[in-house]
Swiss-Prot record:
The keyword Ribonucleoprotein applies. Component of the large ribosomal subunit. Mature ribosomes consist of a small (40S) and a large (60S) subunit. The 40S subunit contains about 32 different proteins and 1 molecule of RNA (18S). The 60S subunit contains 45 different proteins and 3 molecules of RNA (25S, 5.8S and 5S). One of its GO terms (cellular component) is cytosolic large ribosomal subunit. Gene3D superfamilies: 1.10.1200.240, 1.10.1650.10. GO terms for biological process: translation. The gene is RPL19A. Keywords: Cytoplasm, Ribonucleoprotein, Ribosomal protein. This is Large ribosomal subunit protein eL19. InterPro entries: 60S_ribosomal_eL19_sf, Ribosomal_eL19, Ribosomal_eL19_CS, Ribosomal_eL19_dom, Ribosomal_eL19_dom1, Ribosomal_eL19_euk. SMART domains: Ribosomal_L19e.
Length: 190
């Protein structure tokens, strides 16, 4: 049997695959052995004496099944973990996610007019200082802050009304006293 190593190499180069993907017809060895140029190899490839082997199938079904199973929480126990907790899910990434959520909510509330710019600024700083664990706690804080502001406003208005009332009563009392004094002076003069 002729040595067809060169022909196999040339065929691989012509077809554009590796040598292991080239099939040479064992019944046509003499014809293949005579082909010593790329053009001759190309002709043999066209007439089917030299064939490109098909791709070997690498099934991904097992990989897909494993991925699905991991999504359900299997194969994720302590024995399967290689990196540290921070390497697997960096705390920096978690922090960034959380802060972006909080800041987006604050901006939305400010633009909608639910909070004023002063409260926005205070809450922005508080969020940066790790005051709020999640969105719900921030919303609850906003609701509480607004309720407190309303209560303070009502108390201020009440106090102001009381001050006005007291001032009016004081003025009336002074007026009455002045009138009494005048009446007494007028009586004494007669």
């Amino acid at each position: 049997m002729a040595n067809l190593r060169t022909q196999k190499r040339l065929a691989a180069s012509v077809i554009g695959v590796g040598k292991r993907k080239v099939w040479l017809d064992p019944n046509e060895t003499t014809e293949i052995a005579n082909a010593n140029s790329r053009s001759a190899i190309r002709k043999l490839y066209k007439n089917g004496t030299i064939v490109k082997k098909p791709e070997t199938v690498h099934s991904r079904s097992r990989a897909r099944a494993l991925k699905e199973s991991k999504r359900a929480g299997r194969h994720m126990g302590y024995g399967k973990r290689k990196g540290t907790k921070d390497a697997r899910m960096p705390s920096q990434v978690l922090w960034m996610r959380r802060l972006r959520v909080l800041r987006k909510l604050l901006a939305k509330y400010r633009d909608a007019g639910k909070i004023d710019k002063h409260l926005y600024h205070n809450l922005y700083k508080a969020a940066k200082g790790n005051t709020f664990k999640h969105k719900r706690s921030l919303v609850e804080h906003i609701i509480a802050a607004k309720a407190e502001a309303l209560r303070e406003k009502a108390l201020k208005e009440e106090a102001e009304a009381r001050r006005v009332r007291n001032r009016a009563a004081r003025e009336r009392r002074q007026q009455r006293l002045a009138e009494k004094k005048e009446a007494l002076f007028a009586e004494a003069a007669n």
